[in-house]
């Protein structure tokens, strides 16, 4: 009897753990966007949100840099002039609820460097057992969507 009770408790705990860890993500492209024409990315004024989350923002930047996009320095004006019609500039926004079991949301909006028109928006969210777990789940979800779009 006691063994059945323990197995029952373990099964309930496993179901709760599975139900409390959730990720979602999506990509929205502008109607006339030809994402394949973009070969470069310039980081700059790309962040907004809580400065405490700069580590998450840096992780998203690293994920973007690991794609097929080549990172350009804003000071490389000659290369920017040559390639300006194929450069994206991302705005990365991260919010994280400060309690365990809260959400972390990551939104990356890619803008055409020349026109400042939004080309693509990638969103992810994560719900986990702790704040760091939320962030890890959201980062994994955004990584998948970034790779889906640019690799």
PLM regions with names:
Residues 1-23:
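Sec-dependent bacterial lipoprotein signal peptides
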Residues 5, 20-69:
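A structural "domain/chain start" motif
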Residues 11, 32, 97-99:
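Residues embedded in well-ordered secondary-structure elements
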Residues 23-34, 63-66, 70, 117-151:
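C-terminal/domain-edge helix-coil "capping" segments
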Residues 43, 73-99, 106-107:
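A short, hydrophobic beta-strand-centered structural micro-motif
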Residues 49-57, 99-104, 128-139:
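Solvent-exposed, acidic/flexible segments
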Residues 98-128:
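Amphipathic beta-strand/beta-sheet edge segments enriched in Tyr/Trp
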């Amino acid at each position: 009897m006691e063994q059945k009770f323990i197995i029952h408790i373990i099964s309930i705990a496993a179901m709760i753990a599975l139900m409390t860890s959730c990720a979602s993500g999506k990509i929205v492209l502008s109607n006339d966007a030809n994402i394949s024409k973009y070969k470069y990315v310039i980081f700059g004024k790309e962040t907004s949100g809580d400065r405490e989350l700069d580590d998450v923002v840096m992780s998203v930047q690293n994920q973007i840099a690991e794609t097929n996009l080549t990172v350009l320095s804003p000071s490389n004006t000659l290369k920017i002039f040559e390639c300006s019609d194929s450069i994206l500039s991302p705005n990365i926004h991260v919010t994280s609820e400060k309690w365990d079991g809260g959400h972390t949301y990551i939104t990356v909006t890619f803008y055409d460097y020349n026109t400042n028109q939004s080309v693509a928006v990638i969103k992810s969210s994560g719900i986990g057992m702790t704040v760091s777990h939320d962030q890890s789940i959201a980062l994994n979800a955004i990584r998948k969507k970034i790779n889906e779009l640019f690799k």
